[in-house]
């Protein structure tokens, strides 16, 4: 690897860490807990056997079965795991241009990974030849005098790399890759040290990783303080190895998980609710730094690596979890849908919720959505954390509601079709600037369902509490306590432009012109009021500045808007 490529990889990694910091978490305790479970429950004699078979020049179906069986045993013992999740990316948080970029890069990544797994070695294409074919080819090449190109002995110089001779190559998928908990357990057990010694050694390695990618010289110096690190093999490739190998990559990944507050990419957890936001942030860094999918087969660069890991499973710990139960590859498990535009469609008065209900259509939350809301944990909101709330519209007829927690960056944001159209048009002109047809696709019943799901005796902070209090009381939530910061209009909105500049992509519903009447006559155009943006700017006003953290939407889009037109049941 050239020096320029190392610098670029480091820059890409650091920039991705900054942009995705809001999706990172502290997982040291969970990793150590899984390592303890492996130390007590895993058969390390079988671990030793799998390490042995991974050193073989050729491996067969029997070897693969042993690897898969041991991987399944590990999967059964740990809690950090990714689950099978088919993700479909559509226009919403991601723009149509974003989707085109993702589709193209996933296709390039597919091509690169395919070429890497069937590599060129010393100029000779191996293909997917069986052991018998490789032996036959070696004999033929020896016969014609090409003994140094494609012999079957040890070492890469003879043109033969370690190969799996198996009937079904798909069974190899997702059986490799490293897990910090497994690396930690293997170092502890096979290095015959205390678990805490291994944790301390990996923590120091992780601290170096926050500034640069550790190399063999760094490891040698660190091994003087932590002899257990002598087990790490810096010459071992990170390609096509099992989680039981002591590669430098495996140790560095484990070290990243030992840091609390390091904003390491290895600690990202993806869910159906956060996937679009994560990909949006990745594309932002790609655009600013010119990141790309390389045509050269081999190890993945930071952009290729995070794109593959996020798209492999839309539910779980993308870098560090057990993924042995996942079927398929990243480009199979994440599909880009360029056909459907999921923005709320202007379908006219005939498509409003009231018209649908009068025509006999079922308009409202379906059972699975109600069950999701019933468990407040699904909100990802912390019950006792500072929570802002704001509404647009009248308390008896709200059209937009937002809840925002600055500590986590999580927010709930949804809309409602108004019943008083005349009052709505007045409010649109002087406050929120919405088009009523954009609200016809709003999911009915969501306001009551969300307010009902809020924890009892919750404390909510707001700027102006009267309307919010009336709304909560109308839903029977007198137990919720309100803190009104009562700032002046100018003070509460002093970060308005900064908030809209930074977070404008979070809401596209304010399309109209809003005016404000002046005391001495005349009118002046102002920025439309958005419940979510107001929550963010009110918090900035109280805190004295705007936090640059990444915000995470809680409610999936299909819960906020109806994504398809109901059908009449005949």
Curated annotation (Swiss-Prot):
GO terms for biological process: negative stranded viral RNA replication; RNA-templated viral transcription; symbiont-mediated suppression of host cytoplasmic pattern recognition receptor signaling pathway via inhibition of IKBKE activity. InterPro entries: Nucleocapsid_arenaviridae, Nucleocapsid_C_arenaviridae, Nucleocapsid_C_sf, Nucleocapsid_N_arenaviridae. Keywords: Capsid protein, Helical capsid protein, Host cytoplasm, Host-virus interaction, Hydrolase, Inhibition of host IKBKE by virus, Inhibition of host innate immune response by virus, Inhibition of host RLR pathway by virus, Interferon antiviral system evasion, Manganese, Metal-binding, Ribonucleoprotein, RNA-binding, Viral immunoevasion, Viral nucleoprotein, Virion, Zinc. One of its GO terms (cellular component) is viral nucleocapsid. The record marks 467 as: Important for exonuclease activity. It is found in: Virion; Host cytoplasm. Residues 54-241 are annotated as: Binding site for the cap structure m7GTP. Its EC number is 3.1.13.-. Mn(2+) binds at residues 390, 392, 534. Signal peptide: none annotated. Zn(2+) binds at residues 400, 507, 510, 530. GO terms for molecular function: hydrolase activity; metal ion binding; RNA binding. Gene3D superfamilies: 6.10.250.1200, Arenaviral nucleoprotein, C-terminal domain, Arenavirus nucleocapsid protein, head domain. Encapsidates the genome, protecting it from nucleases. The encapsidated genomic RNA is termed the nucleocapsid (NC). Serves as template for viral transcription and replication. The increased presence of protein N in host cell does not seem to trigger the switch from transcription to replication as observed in other negative strain RNA viruses. Homomultimerizes to form the nucleocapsid. Binds to viral genomic RNA. Interacts with glycoprotein G2. Interacts with protein Z; this interaction probably directs the encapsidated genome to budding sites. Interacts with protein L; this interaction does not interfere with Z-L interaction. Interacts with host IKBKE (via Protein kinase domain); the interaction inhibits IKBKE kinase activity. Belongs to the arenaviridae nucleocapsid protein family. The N-terminal region is important for the cap-binding activity while the C-terminal region contains the 3'-5' exoribonuclease activity. A CCHE zinc binding site is present in the C-terminal region and may thus contribute to the substrate binding and/or the specificity of the exonuclease activity. HAMAP family: ARENA_NCAP. This is Nucleoprotein. It comes from Lassa virus (strain GA391) (LASV). The lineage of its organism: Viruses, Riboviria, Orthornavirae, Negarnaviricota, Polyploviricotina.
